C-alpha cells in the first residue's frame, strides 16, 4: 500500500510525473493516487501542471472525438 510520503518522495526524485506513472511505479490503484495527489495539492506540497493544447495536431480539441483526452497532466512538488 502506497503512502502519501511515498508519493511525495517519488515526485521529489523524478521531478515531475503523470498520475498513471506514479500509480504503476508504486503498484497502487489510480483512484488512490489521484486522491493522494489532490491532498498534496490542498496541502500546498504539489502542483498540477496541465499540458498546453498547442501540441494538438488539428488545433481543435473541442471537435475531437476524444475530447481533451490527448492533453496530459503532470504533477510536481512546489
Curated annotation (Swiss-Prot):
Iron-sulfur cluster binds at residues 56, 61, 64, 70. Keywords: DNA-binding, Iron, Iron-sulfur, Metal-binding, Repressor, Transcription, Transcription regulation. It comes from the Bacteria. GO terms for molecular function: DNA binding; iron ion binding; iron-sulfur cluster binding. HAMAP family: FeoC (MF_01586). NCBIfam families: PRK15431.1. May function as a transcriptional regulator that controls feoABC expression. Belongs to the FeoC family. This is Probable [Fe-S]-dependent transcriptional repressor. The gene is feoC.
Amino acid at each position: 500500500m502506497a503512502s502519501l510520503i511515498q508519493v511525495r518522495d517519488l515526485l521529489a526524485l523524478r521531478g515531475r510525473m503523470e498520475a498513471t506513472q506514479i500509480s504503476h511505479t508504486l503498484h497502487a490503484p489510480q483512484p488512490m493516487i489521484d486522491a493522494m495527489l489532490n491532498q498534496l495539492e490542498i496541502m500546498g506540497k504539489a502542483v498540477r501542471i496541465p499540458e498546453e493544447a498547442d501540441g494538438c495536431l488539428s488545433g481543435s480539441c473541442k471537435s475531437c472525438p476524444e475530447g481533451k483526452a490527448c492533453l496530459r497532466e503532470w504533477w510536481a512538488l512546489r
